[in-house]
């Protein structure tokens, strides 16, 4: 299987970076990024006895290698979006949905056809797909930073999956893995920022 061979090849290559951090730490971090899926990436959830500093180094190594893309919170009050980031809140996505499927041993036919099985994994795959498509749409000569917006408030957390800059405009993107789902977070964001346009991706047909 090509995907299995790719995963094995990546893991073999981790040994090249052992002068920075042991390859076993990188491998554990790589798998944890796949397993954690949605939401903020939590370093102490990596299944290893390594220190947080080592896990952070392993994560940055994976980012520099292009195997992982960070999605960083931006307050998004204006452009550039990178001017108001908070790296304490970052999601991590793999570079490919097929790799996520293989690492987690997921049955892709079940995920695509079922309405209620493995919903978390399906949502993660949808977010990865949109994020990687955003990266592909940019120039190959410079890294394309991914941003999100997150608000933590007692009883009223909110998150917009992606926030992008289009010319001088800020556009929120809400990712839905099915045909249903509210857009409360995006509406809240748009009202707070005075934005009139946003994008919602889902399995719904165009109307």
Where are the regions a protein language model picked out?
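Short, solvent-exposed loop/helix junctions and linker helices
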Residues: 23, 49-52, 124, 128
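Short hinge/gating elements
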Residues: 12-17, 42-45, 111-120
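Interdomain motor-coupling "hinge/lid" segment immediately C-terminal to the ATP-binding subdomain
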Residues: 1-40, 63-66
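Amphipathic alpha-helical scaffolds
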Residues: 39-55, 59
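C-terminal helical "lid" subdomain and adjoining coupling/linker elements of P-loop NTPases
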Residues: 1-2, 13-21, 47-50, 76, ...
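A cross-kingdom feature that marks ATP-driven nucleic-acid transaction machinery
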Residues: 57-207
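Short, charged, low-hydrophobicity "junction" segments
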Residues: 5, 38-45, 71-72, 78
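Charged/polar, solvent-exposed surface patches and flexible loops
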Residues: 4-12, 16, 28-31, 48, ...
């Amino acid at each position: 299987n090509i995907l299995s061979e790719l995963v094995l090849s990546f893991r073999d290559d981790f040994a090249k970076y052992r002068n920075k951090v042991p390859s076993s730490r990188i491998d554990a971090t790589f798998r944890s990024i796949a397993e954690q899926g949605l939401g903020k990436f939590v370093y102490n959830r990596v299944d290893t006895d390594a220190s947080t500093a080592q896990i952070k180094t392993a994560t940055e190594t994976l980012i520099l290698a292009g195997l992982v893309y960070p999605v960083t919170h931006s307050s998004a009050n204006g452009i550039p979006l990178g001017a108001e980031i908070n790296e304490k809140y970052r999601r991590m996505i793999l570079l490919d949905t097929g790799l996520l499927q293989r690492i987690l041993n997921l049955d892709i036919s079940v995920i695509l056809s079922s309405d209620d099985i493995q919903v978390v994994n399906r949502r993660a795959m949808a977010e990865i797909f949109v994020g990687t498509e955003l990266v592909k749409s940019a120039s190959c000569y410079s890294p394309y930073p991914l941003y999100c917006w997150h608000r933590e408030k007692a009883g009223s957390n909110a998150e917009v999956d992606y926030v992008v800059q289009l010319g001088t405009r800020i556009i929120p993107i809400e990712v839905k893995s099915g045909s249903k789902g509210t857009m409360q977070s995006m509406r809240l964001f748009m009202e707070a920022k005075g934005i009139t346009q946003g994008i919602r991706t889902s399995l719904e047909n165009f109307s």
